């Protein structure tokens, strides 16, 4: 603990609140004749000089290899955006993704980021590939239903010089204060042939929002408040054959949303399938249910005081989320009966892009269980054009009537990361008291104190056979509160990637205490992993495979897995994932698992799977 504090205190002089850079203004253009969103940028709105023509490589700051032009204008209903993307090798234009909301990371695409509050904190992101497929990121919005997220228009067209895009983003999607005359805006293009992202202006490898253009002289329409209701009926065989439910989302203000769910349709939501690979501790899995993801109420670290996947059924749920200036808050209450109730409240204040403080509480009532947990947390750091470094802390305290269940978790540490040829690092001290208990939370290791650490370094190249490489070193040293060793590890890994393939390898050693037939045992593990990936530029036929082998938990261990995408026609696509585990010794087992998915694209917005 003293060692960690000394290092972090030494870093404080260089980790300070960074001053905003001088603003770059771009006057807004209001149009009386709206452009037609068909991908053809011959409309009169785009015949003036472009707003942006200088694009820069995200990682190095070098000028973009191909010319790109971007325009933006608006009227009383929409924000209109256009891109002209020149391509000297038009046959290389890649636009495989056809499903709206699908990943565009391997395609040629353009993107616009809008900061309506001009606080450099909450970005709206809109992407369109060269086929016209759309995807967006709306701050604090969960779920995938367009009715829930808000609709917008886009189209793309292949041109003799390359390709072009038009977008129409309704003002009603954005949240902004009345009489807002300045917003932040930035433009991006991904070039698949070089696997580069270019931006205008140059935001650096960390997409520093403080460097966004100031879109000035705006006269947006008065903000509107929207209420959305989605009702559903599920029919089935056996047991309850009919179930009806209702989801309602209401904007209380431009900064606050309320959500009500009654008999939510959780069973039709695909959750992540847990791996069969051996682990000493429970895995922390993500939750795809929109009621829980809306507002990003979950904590990001592994020891979570609120872990929504522990709540399986909900009869009625109410949630309020929002942002007020630099304050981000959420409140959640749900119940599946009078004796099963869950409450979660969280508030966070952001000061700049990195610095923050906050607090949270949970309260759980189940048959035979009554439990409360409180938390305070904070972060102080510095973000520059090339990297971000910060120190942070969190303290959680649990209260449970009766004996036991009154403990705490303390976490103190720091982290730093940047672009190519920048050293990444992290160092944390964790103290998890064995008396700590969170009925709606998860703690993979409920009794430990010690440090975890790591560092990485790598580089990227715009041409050549090797496009990226990196090396990583990480480890931890954890003791039980009794003073006995819980776990001590050291891992090393390396990765080399070309434009379309990847090879990676790692080796690690760990001493780990666990129980075998209620007898504490100290295992000496060592594991090798080697893997590769192929067709990484292909949307539907890419794949990867790796194997891990060595000693684990007192026996020999072998674990292998492979994933392959298949294109079965213009509209049929499949993914097959297979994993196999074989172990000897106290935890001897032999298991395998196949996860297969088949999708048929009916339209760009609807599919059967």
Model region roles, listed by residue range:
Residues 5-17:
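Hydrophobic h-region of N-terminal signal peptides that target proteins for export
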Residues 18-344, 348-349:
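Structural preference for beta-rich elements and adjacent junctions enriched in aromatics
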Residues 77-79, 122, 163, 179-183, ...:
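Outer-envelope beta-barrel architecture signal
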Residues 85-87, 116, 169-171, 189, ...:
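Short beta-strand segments enriched in hydrophobic/aromatic residues
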Residues 202-222, 338-374, 379, 383-384, ...:
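Outer-membrane beta-barrel transmembrane domain signature of Gram-negative proteins
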Residues 234-236, 245-247, 263-267, 334-337, ...:
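Conserved short loop/turn motifs at secondary-structure junctions
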Residues 275-279, 376, 411-412, 442-444:
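Short secondary-structure boundary/capping segments
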Residues 313, 388-609:
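Exposed, low-structure sequence patches enriched in small/polar residues
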């Amino acid at each position: 603990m003293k060692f960690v504090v000394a290092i972090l205190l030494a870093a404080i002089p260089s980790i300070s609140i960074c001053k905003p850079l001088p603003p770059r203004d771009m006057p807004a253009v209001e149009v009386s004749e709206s452009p037609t969103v068909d991908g053809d940028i011959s409309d009169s709105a785009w015949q003036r000089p472009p707003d942006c023509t200088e694009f820069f490589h995200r990682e190095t700051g070098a000028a973009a290899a191909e010319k790109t032009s971007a325009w933006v204008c608006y009227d009383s209903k929409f924000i209109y955006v256009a891109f002209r993307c020149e391509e000297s090798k038009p046959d290389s234009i890649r636009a495989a993704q056809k499903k709206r909301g699908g990943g565009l990371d391997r395609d040629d695409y353009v993107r616009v980021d809008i900061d309506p509050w001009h606080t450099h904190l909450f970005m709206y992101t809109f992407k369109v590939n060269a086929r016209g497929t759309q995807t967006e990121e709306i701050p604090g919005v969960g779920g995938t239903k367009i009715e829930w997220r808000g609709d917008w228009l886009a189209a793309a067209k292949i041109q003799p010089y390359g390709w072009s895009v038009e977008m129409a983003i309704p003002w009603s999607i954005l949240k902004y204060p009345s009489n807002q005359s300045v917003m932040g805006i930035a433009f991006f293009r991904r070039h698949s042939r070089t696997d580069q992202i270019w931006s205008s202006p140059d935001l650096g490898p960390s997409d520093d929002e403080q460097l966004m253009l100031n879109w000035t002289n705006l006269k947006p329409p008065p903000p509107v408040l929207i209420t959305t209701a989605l009702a559903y009926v599920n029919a089935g065989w056996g047991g309850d054959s009919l179930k009806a439910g209702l989801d309602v989302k209401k904007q209380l203000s431009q900064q606050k949303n309320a959500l009500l769910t009654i008999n939510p349709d959780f069973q039709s939501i695909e959750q992540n399938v847990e791996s069969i690979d051996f682990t000493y501790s429970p895995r922390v899995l993500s939750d795809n249910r929109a009621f829980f993801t809306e507002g990003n109420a979950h904590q990001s670290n592994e020891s979570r005081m609120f872990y929504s996947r522990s709540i399986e059924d909900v009869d009625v749920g109410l949630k309020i989320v929002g942002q007020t200036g630099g304050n981000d808050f959420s409140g959640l209450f749900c119940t599946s009966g009078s004796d099963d109730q869950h409450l979660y409240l969280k508030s966070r204040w952001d000061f700049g892009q990195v610095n923050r403080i906050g607090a949270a509480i949970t309260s759980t009532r189940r048959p035979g269980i009554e439990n409360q947990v409180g938390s305070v947390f904070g972060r102080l750091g510095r973000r520059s054009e090339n990297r971000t470094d910060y120190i942070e802390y969190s303290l959680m305290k649990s209260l449970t009537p009766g004996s036991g269940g009154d403990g705490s978790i303390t976490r103190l540490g720091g982290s730093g990361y940047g672009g190519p040829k920048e050293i990444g690092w992290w160092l944390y001290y964790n103290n998890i008291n064995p008396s700590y208990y969170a009925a709606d939370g998860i703690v993979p290791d409920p009794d430990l104190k010690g440090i975890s650490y790591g560092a990485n370094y790598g580089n990227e190249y715009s041409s050549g056979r090797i496009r990226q490489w990196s090396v990583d070193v990480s480890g931890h040293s954890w003791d039980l509160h009794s003073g006995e060793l819980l776990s001590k590890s050291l891992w090393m890994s390396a990765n080399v990637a070309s434009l379309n393939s990847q090879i990676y390898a790692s080796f690690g050693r760990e001493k780990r205490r666990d129980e075998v037939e209620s007898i504490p045992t100290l295992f000496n593990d060592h594991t090798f992993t080697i893997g590769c990936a192929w067709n990484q530029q292909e949307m539907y036929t890419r794949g990867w495979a790796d194997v891990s082998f060595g000693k684990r938990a007192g026996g020999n261990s072998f674990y292998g897995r492979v994933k392959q995408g298949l294109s079965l026609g213009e509209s049929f696509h499949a993914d097959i994932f297979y994993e196999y585990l074989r172990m000897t010794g106290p935890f001897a087992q032999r298991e395998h698992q196949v996860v297969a998915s088949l999708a048929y694209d009916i339209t760009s917005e609807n599919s059967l799977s």
